């Protein structure tokens, strides 16, 4: 998208990420997406308030606790989140609204589509439960939560980073007019990531894992199959330590252990994918510049494997670069297990923010975006990871093909 098109696209797009913030003055939150195009903060684009930012970030930070505390958990203080009401199982969804490569709808209508298309367990449609609707009410992370069956742990994340490009740019490039050295280094690091290659790497690994799951009826058989598949493909992951999250991911998946899920039988599971966008400068002990403009060394994938160590991801948002700014801490998109080979034709499901129909944010909307729409960044984020998790094959939350909107 070139600069001359940006205003038109931003003016017509709905709030498509689980993000919000204060409306800064012109240029305050502007960044560059690596193609010579200016990207703005989500706050500037969608005119959400500083209070919205604080509420969204607080709720996002409380979500992991909610995932273990159960549906009765409520975030403290200003949590105006509301669980969407139940929808009749046989009620058909209304058409989604198309908008520049994505389809948009309200959360209640998404529940109707989910029940018709994604709810099936062993071929039978299910009504979305109160607990699932509670998960969904958290916004972008809620969409991934309800489809994966667990709050996302992000342990098995992949990305692609061009080390040579990064070094060459630092050596031969120079800051732009008005750009500090810290801004320059953060921008070059961000531009050295390739989201499409990171996504493709996650797809490659998920494919290997799915082959290893076939005909493996215990974890030992699965791990043996996995190591053979990696060796046959000369994949660098074959050298991962036995304690690596790569090898423990399946056993740490709750649905793998559930009687109505995997029941400890790997052949009943399949590897699926979701994505997380977030900020690199999360280390509170690092310099203020890194917290504002990004930490070039943080969350880089391991050479060869593409694995990203997410253990230091604390859902901490970008620090303001000027008074009054606010940035949101993350965004999630659900991919599942689509077989479409062309990344640009894949569909990513995500939400704008938590469901607050009686608050200033308003009702949650759900979006089905093509990959280019999903991966196109905002200045709130400088990292995009593509994460593998597992769901039972008996679930239909990750079908081979996803059709945008309804019908």
Swiss-Prot record:
Record keyword Cell division present: no
Which Pfam families does this entry report, sorted A to Z? Transglut_prok
Q: Where is the signal peptide?
A: 1-31
Q: How is it used?
A: Sold under the name Activa TG by Ajinomoto. It has the ability to cross-link protein molecules present in food without the use of salt or binders. Used to improve some of the physical properties such as firmness, elasticity and moisture retention of food such as meat, poultry and seafood.
Region ranges (Disordered): 62-98, 282-322
Supply the Gene3D superfamilies for this chain.
Protein-glutamine gamma-glutamyltransferase
Q: Where is the composition biased (Low complexity)?
A: 62-72
List the active site.
Answer: 140, 331, 350
Compositional bias, Basic and acidic residues, is annotated for 76-94, 286-298
Catalyzed reaction equations: L-glutaminyl-[protein] + L-lysyl-[protein] = [protein]-L-lysyl-N(6)-5-L-glutamyl-[protein] + NH4(+)
Q: What is its EC number?
A: 2.3.2.13
Q: Does the keyword Acyltransferase apply?
A: yes
UniProt keyword terms in alphabetical order: Acyltransferase, Signal, Transferase, Zymogen
InterPro entries associated with the record: Papain-like_cys_pep_sf (IPR038765), Transglut_prok (IPR015107), Transglut_prok_sf (IPR037084)
Q: Which residues form the propeptide?
A: 32-76
Question: What would you give as a GO molecular function for this chain, any one?
Answer: protein-glutamine gamma-glutamyltransferase activity
Function noted in UniProt: Catalyzes the cross-linking of proteins and the conjugation of polyamines to proteins.
Q: Which family does it belong to?
A: Belongs to the bacterial TGase family.
UniProt protein name:
Protein-glutamine gamma-glutamyltransferase
Organism encoding this protein: Streptomyces mobaraensis
